[in-house]
Amino acid sequence: AQIAGYVQSAQRQRGLHALVDVGGGTLDVVTFIVHERDGEDVFPFLVPEIRALGTQMLYQNRLVEAPEHEKSKLPDELQPVLNTLEYAKCTGLPEDHIALRDNVFWSEVHSTVHRVFHHTKRNRYRLSEAWTKGLPVFLTGGGGSVEGYQKSVKSGGLNCAPVMNLMLLPKHPKLADFSGTTSDYQRVSVACGLAQDAFSLGQLIPAGQVENDDNSLHRVADRPDRDELYAR
């Protein structure tokens, strides 16, 4: 639903893409294909993964084994995410402790992204041009503008593709009256996408119905022909 605006925009490209949605509680990562078959948009999903690595988890991680602190000084989780130095000044906690905990957290984000992209490249879409020319990655959600997530997404994918082309989701053409900024739209993109007519989204193919990119596997009955799903 989130990519509804993209597929109806001038930015649209065929082929492999990734979406990384940074919410309050979770980090959602998925690779998918933008394709068209018989005049209908088709979106095969390849590798989805959801981890408890959202912005609230980032803050909770900073308090693990932390020295005594005043809870009243903890920042409001509904406000923009504070970086290491800002968080230290706000809470009075040692900056080196927060930096250490942040390194642990960003390593987990890096590993999650790498795992999804590596599995996609090795088993799901080996011949995609994205592996040589660069992978388009939508980084969205309330935490998408946080530098740590941006760096971790880029580093997590660099062993798979030479460039991670981080992109913002464009507004849906039917939402011309949306008064917020492009950054604001990233926070509400799920709701905006779901508000569209379901038939306008095209055909969504769950990952479980898309065969691995491996000729040694026998075709599973009732699954779409993979040659019809993979953009060439």
Placement of each model-derived feature along the sequence:
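Generic recognition of flexible, low-complexity loop/linker segments
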Residues: 4-8, 15-19, 120-129, 134-136, ...
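Short, conserved secondary-structure transition motifs
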Residues: 1-7, 54-59, 173-177
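Nucleotide/phosphate-binding catalytic cleft detector across ATP-hydrolyzing
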Residues: 1-18, 192-212, 219-232
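N-terminal phosphate-binding loop and flanking beta/alpha elements of the actin-like ATPase fold
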Residues: 1-15, 146-148, 153-160, 167-168
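Conserved phosphate-binding/catalytic loops in two-lobed NTP-binding clefts
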Residues: 1, 155-190
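Phosphate-binding glycine-rich/basic clefts of nucleotide- and phosphate-handling proteins
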Residues: 31-152, 213-222
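Conserved structured core elements
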Residues: 20-23, 99, 103, 107, ...
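Gly/Thr-rich phosphate-binding beta-strand-loop-beta motif of the actin/hexokinase/Hsp70
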Residues: 7-45, 194
